[in-house]
């Protein structure tokens, strides 16, 4: 068994030294002992060290990652804010040093993918078949999704103490495959409960408490003074985020039988086929060994696993209803049951500060289960009902003189024709032009693509630069660099708006399993050959100051808000 010999970030206790974990000999984890006030990537950044070995280990051979020099990193200089004036008139300049009045501060995390790694209905069998998307099907870091979220919550609490947050929001893909136990783990971590990140029978791959990924732990819980909200992602109501749940997989997931499926990327009837056994991870082994994955015809038998009724799939409405079973605020975390339909609506809006003219419009732009597709269900879409609801919200906000932010899982205008984009480019382009007619719209925030991308949607009329908006995507909390963002909405002295979007790395000082996850996340990226060039600097992190013009009416209203007469 291999051990971590240097856990310099941990407090001195039984969990610190000589602890046997499913990790690597001499794994050096840089200390964030002096992380405060170096809390964001503006202050410091994770620098991935180059691999010199000519041998690349298999992604399934986590025990050898460190032996071949994979997963190593250290802290380096931070990334300053890149001031973006794309939406402003030609010749405009803004002194970055001038004083700014803060209107709103919040954090957003996305694509957390809380994962039951022992589910009999995984997508592990497909990881060698889909290129870089394979990382979404399998990686050793899947063992630690609960602990990474706990580290992010701890970090948000620390940031809140330094500079208070008005709210937090999760932008969808809270879980990996819409299972009840995954949804409960997500909510319970935010609520600060005892977490048992194990399913089936109790596993203890490394005997003793608090020393392996299956062991129970006490979640920190989000500071009770921070309200948190949620948006729906495709993984929150589709099997593995790609196919509607049918009776076959619904029965399999709570049974001892590993699910079998066809070619999910080409066959519309794949969920009723048995070409592949999807596989699972053996929770009794230190590294979560893959079992039961392969071409069905080439397997003598598929192993049975311990069944668990808590793995049952939840519908979209049931996921939203579960958000009401919480000890933190607001109850329901944004989702409101409508009396007319007797169901939950994945779209809602809220005003984070009673005296501030700004509202957040939370939009469900995932596909509907009733659609018939030959490929996957990861596209963005708005049918007439949701589209009309969005436009009514924007019209009301404009009429009432409120700044507006759209929060959705799937971004807009970024990947035409791709499974991570919108299903209909024409509809998407029309929506972009509609959005530009609402000058009080500041920002569309999203996840889904697991990128730190920023895009400007400038006005089509140079005489009205206010008819424009920004879009900011945020990285997945699961894969490297495992970040979330803070957003600061500021009023400049010239009555323009600055939006500071800042990447944050979770603090790992008190969380050895989050530290291991970071190591695995970096190694997995290196093994899959993934290079992030999703922003102008070609770096995984991207901090920006986004400047936006306001109408004369909103300039006056906000100036009076800051300095009332």
Feature-to-residue mapping (PLM):
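C-terminal motif of bacterial Sec signal peptides marking the signal peptidase cleavage site
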Residues: 19-23
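Bacterial N-terminal signal peptides that target proteins for export
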Residues: 1-11
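Metal-dependent phosphoesterase/phosphodiesterase active-site architecture
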Residues: 26-160, 166-167, 208-209, 250-400, ...
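Active-site environment of divalent metal-dependent phosphoester hydrolases
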Residues: 116, 176-178, 235-241, 369-371, ...
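Short, surface-exposed basic-aromatic patches at helix termini and helix-loop junctions that form
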Residues: 187-192, 220-222, 430-439, 455-469, ...
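Active-site neighborhood of phospho(di)ester-bond hydrolases with catalytic His/Asp-centered motifs
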Residues: 108-110, 167-173, 224, 229-233, ...
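Core catalytic region of metal-dependent phosphoesterases/phosphodiesterases
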Residues: 144-260
């Amino acid at each position: 068994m291999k051990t971590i010999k240097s856990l310099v970030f941990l407090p001195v206790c039984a969990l610190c030294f000589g602890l046997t974990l499913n990790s690597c000999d001499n794994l050096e984890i840089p200390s964030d002992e002096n992380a405060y006030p170096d809390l964001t990537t503006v202050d410091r950044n994770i620098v991935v060290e180059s691999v010199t070995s000519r041998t690349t280990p298999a992604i399934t051979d986590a025990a050898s990652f460190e032996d071949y020099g994979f997963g190593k990193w250290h802290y380096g200089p931070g990334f300053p804010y890149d001031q973006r004036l794309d939406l402003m008139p030609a010749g405009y300049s803004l002194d970055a040093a001038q004083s700014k009045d803060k209107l709103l501060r919040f954090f957003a995390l996305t694509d957390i993918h809380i994962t039951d790694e022992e589910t009999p209905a995984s997508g592990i069998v497909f990881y060698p078949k889909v290129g870089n998307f394979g990382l979404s099907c399998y990686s050793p870091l899947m063992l630690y999704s609960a602990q990474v979220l706990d580290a992010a919550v701890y970090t948000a609490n620390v940031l809140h103490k330094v500079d208070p947050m008005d709210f937090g929001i999760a932008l969808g893909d809270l879980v990996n495959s819409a299972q009840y136990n995954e949804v409960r783990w997500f909510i319970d971590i935010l609520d600060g409960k005892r977490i048992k990140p194990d399913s089936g029978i109790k596993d203890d791959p490394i005997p003793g408490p608090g020393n392996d990924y299956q062991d129970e732990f006490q979640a920190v819980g989000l500071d009770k003074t921070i309200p948190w909200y949620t948006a729906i992602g495709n993984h929150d109501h589709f099997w593995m985020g790609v196919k509607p749940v049918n009776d076959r997989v619904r029965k399999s997931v709570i049974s001892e039988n590993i699910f079998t499926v066809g070619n999910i990327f080409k066959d519309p009837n794949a969920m009723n086929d048995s070409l592949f056994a999807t596989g699972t991870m053996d929770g009794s082994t230190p590294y979560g060994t893959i079992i039961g994955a392969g071409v069905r015809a080439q397997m003598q038998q598929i192993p049975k696993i311990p069944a668990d009724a808590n793995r049952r799939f939840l519908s979209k409405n049931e996921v939203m209803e579960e958000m009401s079973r919480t000890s933190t605020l607001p109850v329901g975390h944004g989702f409101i049951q409508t009396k007319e339909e007797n169901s939950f609506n994945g779209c809602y809006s809220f005003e984070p500060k009673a005296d501030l003219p700004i509202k957040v419009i939370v939009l469900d732009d995932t596909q509907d289960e009733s659609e018939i597709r030959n490929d996957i269900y990861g596209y963005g879409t708005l049918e007439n009902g949701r589209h009309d609801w969005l436009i009514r919200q924007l019209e009301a906000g404009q009429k009432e003189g409120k700044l507006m932010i759209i929060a959705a899982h799937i971004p807009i205008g970024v990947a035409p024709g791709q499974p991570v984009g919108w299903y209909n480019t024409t509809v998407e382009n029309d929506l972009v032009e509609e959005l530009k007619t609402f000058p009080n719209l500041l920002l569309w925030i999203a996840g889904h693509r697991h990128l730190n991308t920023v895009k400007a949607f400038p006005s089509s009329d140079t005489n009205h630069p206010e008819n424009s908006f920004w879009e900011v995507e945020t990285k997945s909390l699961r894969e490297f660099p495992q970040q979330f963002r803070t957003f600061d909405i500021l009023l400049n002295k010239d009555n323009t708006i600055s939006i500071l979007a800042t990447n944050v790395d979770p603090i790992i000082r008190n969380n050895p399993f989050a530290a291991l996850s970071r190591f695995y996340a970096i190694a997995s990226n290196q093994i899959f050959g993934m290079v992030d060039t999703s922003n102008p600097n070609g770096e995984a992190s991207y901090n920006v100051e986004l400047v936006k013009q306001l109408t004369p009416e909103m300039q006056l209203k906000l100036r009076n808000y800051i300095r009332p007469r």
